[in-house]
């Protein structure tokens, strides 16, 4: 099973990046794609950004789910809407959006996207995340891990964790999960030479391949096989 994860960074420099993203996805041919910072801007398209990308792929994904639920005012005074999306070659059986706890001084409400996908006759559970870009990201990871444990679920957690040093929080997950960074040291946010994007797989799984997609966004795409 091949999976790609990419923070789209909305429509920034979209005229230069759109074709690169489409070309990359056509090349890697992942079974499932997870996006963060997916915009919906009706001035650009009646489709949200993930749907727009999917419509232009040479082999589009049959199944998709999006949660465009976050609104905020940009620096130029315009309303912006964004969220999380998944594209899948396999049937999406169930999806769920959960709002994470919000600290009073945190500017944005964060959500997670749980999707259950039928892969080869077996139900595989995923959680797509985009945590706060501040110290609360550690707490949000702990909240997600606790929720999954309390539900007695096995999930692959993927997305923009906004945690630069994943080893500093490894005590939260190391007994149950393997991190992508422990398998391959990589940079996912080149402008700061940082690694904010991660994949956590249950410890009984293993990564069989891992690669980066560069110059698609301010984040690099992560593509991995398990």
PLM features: residue spans?
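Active-site regions of metal-assisted phosphoester/phosphodiester hydrolases
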Residues: 1-32, 45, 63-66, 71-226
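Active-site neighborhood of divalent metal-dependent phosphoester/pyrophosphate hydrolases
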Residues: 36-43
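Glycine-rich loop at the start of a catalytic domain that most often binds anionic cofactors/ligands
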Residues: 48
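Charged, glycine-enriched surface loops/patches
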Residues: 54-61, 87
């Amino acid at each position: 099973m091949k999976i790609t994860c990419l923070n789209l960074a909305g429509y920034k420099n979209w005229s230069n990046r759109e074709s690169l993203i489409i070309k990359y996805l056509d090349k890697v041919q992942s079974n499932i794609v997870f996006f963060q910072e997916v915009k919906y801007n009706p001035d650009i398209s009646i489709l949200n950004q993930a749907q727009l990308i999917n419509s232009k792929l040479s082999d589009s994904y049959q199944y998709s789910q999006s949660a465009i639920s976050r609104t905020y005012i940009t620096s130029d005074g315009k309303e912006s809407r964004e969220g999380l999306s998944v594209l899948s070659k396999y049937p999406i059986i169930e999806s769920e959006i959960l709002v994470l706890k919000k600290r009073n001084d945190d500017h944005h409400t964060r959500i997670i996207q749980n999707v259950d996908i039928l892969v080869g006759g077996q139900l595989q559970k995923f959680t797509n995340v985009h945590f706060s870009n501040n110290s609360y990201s550690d707490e949000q990871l702990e909240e997600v891990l606790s929720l999954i444990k309390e539900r007695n679920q096995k999930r692959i957690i993927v997305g923009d964790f906004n945690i630069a040093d994943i080893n500093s929080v490894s005590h939260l997950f190391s007994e149950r999960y393997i991190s992508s960074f422990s398998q391959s040291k990589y940079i996912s946010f080149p402008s700061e030479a940082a690694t904010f994007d991660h994949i956590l797989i249950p410890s009984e799984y293993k990564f069989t391949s891992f690669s980066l997609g560069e110059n698609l966004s301010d984040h690099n795409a992560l593509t991995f096989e398990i």
